[in-house]
C-alpha cells in the first residue's frame, strides 16, 4: 500500500514543522509531495533542509490551490500510489489518522473522499466550517450505533471509558467536505479526475465532491480519526465575503452536474436577490452578469465532468 500526502505551500512557514512533521510521525508510512507556490518566506528552502525525504517542487509562479494539487494528483497516478491525502499547510494529523482512514476506505470502497474530524489546535472544538457540514449528519454517536463519548473526545472510548469498535461505525455521509484533510483512493481519483480549472482557489473541493457523487461515490467523515485545521478566523472585507459566498457559491451550483443547469440557473437568480438584500450591496448583480458571461465555460465544465 502506497500513500502520497500532497501539501501545497504558499508563505506558510510557521505551520510547516507541525504539518510535515505529523506525516513523518504517522503510524502508517506515507510519502510527502510538497508543491511550493513561489513562496517568499523561505518555505521551500526550509522544506529542503528539514524534510529531505519529501518530493519538493518549486513553482516559478503561484498556480493556485487547485492546479498545484492537480500536479500532485498526476504525480500520484504516474507513480502508482494507492491513496492520496490532501493536507493543507495549516493543518496536521495524529499518528493514527492515516491508518484509521485507510482502514475505513478499504471497508467502504464506495467513498471517494474520507475526512477525519477537522478540529482546532488543541482538539478543543470542531473547526467552525467543518461543524456546519458535520453537525446535521450525525453529531450524536448513537445514531451511528456507537456509544456516545464526550463531545470532542476521540471516539475510541465510550462514556464509561470502554473501547468502541470502529468497524461497527460506518462513515458519516455528507454532501461535501472541505479539502484541508482528504483521503482519496486511486479508483476514485481516476474516475472523478482533477480539480476543475474554473475553481483556482475557492469552490474546487465542493465541485469535486459533486462530481464524485455524480459518478456514484459517497463523501464521508470518519469520526474515529482526528486532525487539526489551524486556520485563523478574522473579519474580512464585505467584498471578499460576497465573492466567496455568493460568486463562488453560485459557480459551484451552476457546475453541479447532479442537477439540470436550468434549475440551478433559476436558483442562482433568486440567490442573487437574497444576497443583494442581505449584504445591502449591488455586487451580487455585478457577479451575476459575470456568471452569465461564463455560461459557455460552465457548460463545458459540466460536459467534462460527466465523462
State where each predicted segment sits.
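Non-catalytic, C-terminal membrane-associated alpha-helical segments of glycosyltransferases
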Residues: 241-252, 256-307
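Glycine-rich, basic loop-to-helix element that forms the pyrophosphate-binding segment
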Residues: 59-79
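A short, conserved alpha-helix in the catalytic core of glycosyltransferases
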Residues: 175-193, 198-226
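A conserved acidic beta->alpha catalytic loop
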Residues: 22, 36-45, 61
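Acidic/His-rich active-site region of diverse nucleotide-sugar glycosyltransferases
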Residues: 71, 91-192
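N-proximal low-complexity "stem/linker" segments adjacent to membrane-targeting elements
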Residues: 1-22
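Short beta-strand-to-loop acidic/aromatic patch adjacent to the donor-nucleotide binding site
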Residues: 81-92
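Short, acidic, metal-binding catalytic loop of nucleotide-sugar glycosyltransferases
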Residues: 21-30
Amino acid at each position: 500500500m502506497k500513500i502520497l500526502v500532497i501539501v501545497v505551500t504558499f508563505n506558510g512557514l510557521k505551520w510547516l514543522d507541525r504539518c510535515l512533521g505529523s506525516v513523518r510521525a504517522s503510524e502508517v508510512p506515507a510519502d510527502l509531495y510538497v508543491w511550493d507556490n513561489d513562496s517568499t518566506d523561505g518555505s521551500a528552502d526550509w522544506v529542503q533542509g528539514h524534510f529531505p525525504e519529501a518530493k519538493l517542487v518549486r513553482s516559478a509562479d503561484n498556480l493556485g490551490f487547485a492546479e498545484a494539487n492537480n500536479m500532485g494528483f498526476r504525480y500520484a497516478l504516474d507513480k502508482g500510489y494507492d491513496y492520496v491525502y490532501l493536507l493543507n499547510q495549516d493543518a496536521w494529523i495524529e499518528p493514527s489518522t492515516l491508518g484509521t482512514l485507510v482502514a475505513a476506505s478499504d471497508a467502504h470502497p464506495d467513498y471517494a473522499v474520507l475526512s477525519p474530524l477537522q478540529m482546532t489546535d488543541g482538539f478543543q472544538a470542531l473547526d467552525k466550517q467543518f461543524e456546519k457540514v458535520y453537525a446535521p449528519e450525525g453529531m450524536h454517536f448513537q445514531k451511528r450505533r456507537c456509544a456516545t463519548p464526550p463531545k470532542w473526545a476521540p471516539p475510541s472510548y465510550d462514556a464509561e471509558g470502554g473501547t468502541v469498535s470502529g468497524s461497527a461505525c460506518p462513515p458519516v455521509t455528507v454532501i461535501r467536505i472541505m479539502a484541508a484533510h482528504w483521503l482519496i483512493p486511486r479508483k476514485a481519483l481516476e474516475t472523478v479526475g482533477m480539480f476543475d480549472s474554473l475553481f483556482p482557489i475557492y469552490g474546487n473541493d465542493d465541485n469535486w465532491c459533486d462530481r464524485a457523487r455524480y459518478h456514484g461515490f459517497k463523501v464521508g467523515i470518519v469520526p474515529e480519526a482526528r486532525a487539526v485545521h489551524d486556520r485563523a478566523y478574522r473579519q474580512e472585507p464585505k467584498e471578499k465575503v460576497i465573492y466567496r459566498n455568493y460568486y463562488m457559491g453560485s459557480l459551484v451550483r451552476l457546475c453541479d452536474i447532479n442537477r439540470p443547469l436550468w434549475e440551478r440557473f433559476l436558483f442562482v437568480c433568486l440567490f442573487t436577490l437574497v444576497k443583494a438584500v442581505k449584504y445591502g450591496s449591488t455586487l451580487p448583480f455585478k457577479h451575476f452578469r459575470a456568471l452569465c458571461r461564463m455560461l459557455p465555460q460552465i457548460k463545458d465544465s459540466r460536459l467534462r465532468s460527466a465523462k
